[in-house]
Curated annotation (Swiss-Prot):
PANTHER family: NADH DEHYDROGENASE [UBIQUINONE] IRON-SULFUR PROTEIN 2, MITOCHONDRIAL (PTHR11993:SF10), NADH-UBIQUINONE OXIDOREDUCTASE 49 KDA SUBUNIT (PTHR11993)
Name of the encoding gene: nuoD
Recorded family membership: Belongs to the complex I 49 kDa subunit family.
GO CC list: plasma membrane
InterPro entries: NADH_Q_OxRdtase_suD, NADH_UbQ_OxRdtase_49kDa_CS, NDH1_su_D/H, NiFe-Hase_large
Annotated EC: 7.1.1.-
NCBIfam families in alphabetical order: NuoD, PRK06075.1
The entry's keywords: Cell inner membrane, Cell membrane, Membrane, NAD, Quinone, Translocase, Transport, Ubiquinone
Listed HAMAP family: NDH1_NuoD
Protein's UniProt keywords contain Translocase: yes
Phylogenetic classification of the source organism: Bacteria, Pseudomonadati, Pseudomonadota, Alphaproteobacteria, Hyphomicrobiales
UniProt-recorded name of the protein: NADH-quinone oxidoreductase subunit D
Swiss-Prot/TrEMBL catalytic activity: a quinone + NADH + 5 H(+)(in) = a quinol + NAD(+) + 4 H(+)(out)
Length: 392
């Protein structure tokens, strides 16, 4: 009898796969149904963001950050404006800092709600996304009332925020917090103890603390493994050092623990939002330096100097002192960092973006090895990939 050669099966997962969360292409090598190798192919959404920013003024560069992790846009803007402010040596007014923290936490809930519910959908639960998106819709309206846009807000500016919040908005956000907490309880009742959900996520994609550090993980990917590392506590920025909140950590570092961390983080975000509204001071929402922040419309109607400032800011932009700085924020997906180099001109010399999802996706081979084919989508769902920031 002739000898038969056994070969592994190669399978393309994506780029149009419903569980791929965007334009991901994975080339899987399977032995039967067991995954032997995972080869992620990225770059299908590459738009050259870092290079484009080098040809734009600092004011024009901010909207590019909305388009990275487009699930929680303001968190990305935050890192860029922090970097520019450190180079300029600006002190942001306290009201602006509280507004930024408030909207960063709204962004965290937006991202986690999407992730938790789609993670459940990836393993077969169809109801959670319908409940989660109802709450996301309310948060999108808060985005819209502050900035005029539901998604690409362009609200954080160097020196503060674009404009003050409209009346009654803070009251509406405060009234949203308690009912939202109830919705989170309902969601947990639906999936936390669900037998099928646990079978699909417990002990799947386990990451130890050492592995998390070696792969450069951040955010929920390290906290799920038991490390209480959160930049809001470790390197406090804005007013986080004044706020009271807990950092949820997991024990086993598997998909299920990461899900539980995200659920608890949303509750902590609601706590932070309520504190921000209770402690919100009065005063200006951006620095009063006319060389950096455009004047108000009413001022431009009265003052020729204000009109000149406005014209200069929107044509030439402001010049940033030469130097380099790295600013990182705790984005929903992990440590989102911006390494900004200025040569003293009105455009960044170099802007390197450190996207958390990039480090997480590179470990797909390590995470999936030895698991079943069906577990690939569960692992992918739990590492929370958005392709805007991975490919940028």
């Amino acid at each position: 009898m002739a000898e038969q050669e056994l070969r592994n099966y190669h399978l393309n997962f994506g780029p149009q796969h419903p569980a791929a969360h965007g334009v991901l292409r994975l080339v899987l090598e399977l032995d039967g149904e067991v995954v032997e190798r995972v080869d992620p192919h990225i770059g299908l959404l590459h738009r050259g963001t870092e290079k484009l920013i080098e040809y734009k003024t600092y004011l024009q560069a901010t909207p590019y950050f909305d388009r990275l992790d487009y699930v929680a846009p303001m968190n990305q803007e935050h890192a860029f404006v922090l970097a520019a402010e450190r180079l300029l040596g600006l002190e942001v007014p306290r009201r602006a800092q509280f507004i930024r923290v408030l909207y960063s936490e709204i962004g965290r809930i937006l991202a986690h709600l999407l992730n938790v519910t789609t993670q459940a959908m990836d393993v077969g639960a169809l109801t959670p996304p319908l409940w989660g998106f109802e709450e996301r819709e309310k948060l999108m309206i808060f985005y819209e009332r502050a900035s005029g846009a539901r998604l690409h807000a362009n609200y954080f500016r160097t020196g503060g925020v674009h404009r003050d919040l409209p009346p009654k908005l803070l009251e509406d956000i405060y009234n949203f917090c308690d009912p939202c907490s109830q919705v989170l309880d309902d969601l947990e009742g639906l999936i936390t103890d669900n037998r099928i959900f646990k079978q699909r996520n417990v002990d799947i994609g386990v990451v130890s603390q050492e592995e998390a550090l070696e792969w450069g993980f951040s955010g929920v990917m390290v906290r799920g493994s038991g490390m209480a590392w959160d930049l809001r506590r470790a390197q406090p920025y804005e007013v986080y050092s004044e706020l009271d909140f807990d950092i949820p950590v997991g024990k086993n570092g598997d998909c299920y623990d990461r899900y539980l961390c995200r659920m608890e983080e949303m509750r902590q975000s609601l706590r932070i939002m309520k504190q921000c509204i209770e402690l919100m001071p009065g005063g200006p929402v951006h620095v009063l330096d006319g060389k950096v922040v455009p004047p108000s419309r009413s001022e431009m109607k009265r003052s020729m100097e204000a009109l000149i400032h406005h014209f200069k800011l929107y044509t030439e932009g402001y010049h940033v002192p030469a130097g380099e700085v790295y600013a990182a924020v705790e984005a929903p997906k992990g440590e989102f960092g911006v390494y900004l180099v200025s040569d003293g001109g009105n455009k960044p010399y170099k802007c390197k973006i450190r996207a958390p999802g990039y480090a997480h996706l590179q470990a797909m081979d390590h995470l999936c090895k030895g698991h079943m084919l069906a577990d690939v989508s569960a692992i992918l769902g739990s590492i929370d990939i958005v392709f805007g920031e991975v490919d940028r």
